[in-house]
């Protein structure tokens, strides 16, 4: 998909995933090195069907990234869950996030999903505003018990 000079495509080979490391670090700081990140992505791809989709500028630079899975629950039916969504610092508020959400929405419909879900940390107020502008609604709280 291409829109507003942004090309959106699945990142599937090892080099694509390796290229995503520095951008994903802006969101997920728990991996201290590229190798542990690559291993985690591969494990998630194998175990949960995790996918990465990238938004690339006209020069091929990775400007945005989303990680997602398909899932199904009695309460929701089949849905697409966005686990990671990050836009490169310096490129935020330029429509790239909207292009990714649009791609994810279309992709979810094409795969028979009835909804798109994501969690967002309480302190990410700018992200909350963005998601609301994109049509997502606050519908639940997410509770956690660290073990």
Where do the model's predicted regions map?
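Conserved GNAT-family N-acetyltransferase fold
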Residues: 53, 64-66, 80, 85, ...
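Acetyl-CoA-dependent GNAT
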Residues: 2-6, 10-77, 102, 146
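A conserved beta-turn-beta hairpin within the catalytic core of GNAT-like acetyltransferases
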Residues: 72-82, 92, 138-139
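Conserved active-site alpha-helix within GNAT-family acetyltransferase domains
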Residues: 98, 122-141, 145
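Conserved GNAT acetyl-CoA-binding A-motif
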Residues: 108-119
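Conserved acetyl-CoA-binding loop-helix of GNAT-fold acetyltransferases
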Residues: 87, 93-106, 133
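Residue-level recognition of the GNAT/N-acetyltransferase active site
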Residues: 88, 121
């Amino acid at each position: 998909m291409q829109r507003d000079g942004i090309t959106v495509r699945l990142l599937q080979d090892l080099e694509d995933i390796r290229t995503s490391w520095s951008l994903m670090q802006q969101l997920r700081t728990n991996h201290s090195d590229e190798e542990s990140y690559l291993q985690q992505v591969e494990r998630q791809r194998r175990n949960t069907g995790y996918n990465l989709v990238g938004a690339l500028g006209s020069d091929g630079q990775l400007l945005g990234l989303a990680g997602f899975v398909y899932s199904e629950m009695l309460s929701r039916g089949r849905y697409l869950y966005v686990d990671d969504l990050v836009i490169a610092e310096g490129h935020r508020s330029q429509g790239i996030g909207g292009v990714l959400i649009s791609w994810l929405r279309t992709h979810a419909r094409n795969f028979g999903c009835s909804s798109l879900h994501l969690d967002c940390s309480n302190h990410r107020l700018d992200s909350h505003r963005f998601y609301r502008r994109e049509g997502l609604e606050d519908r639940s709280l997410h509770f956690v018990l660290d073990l």
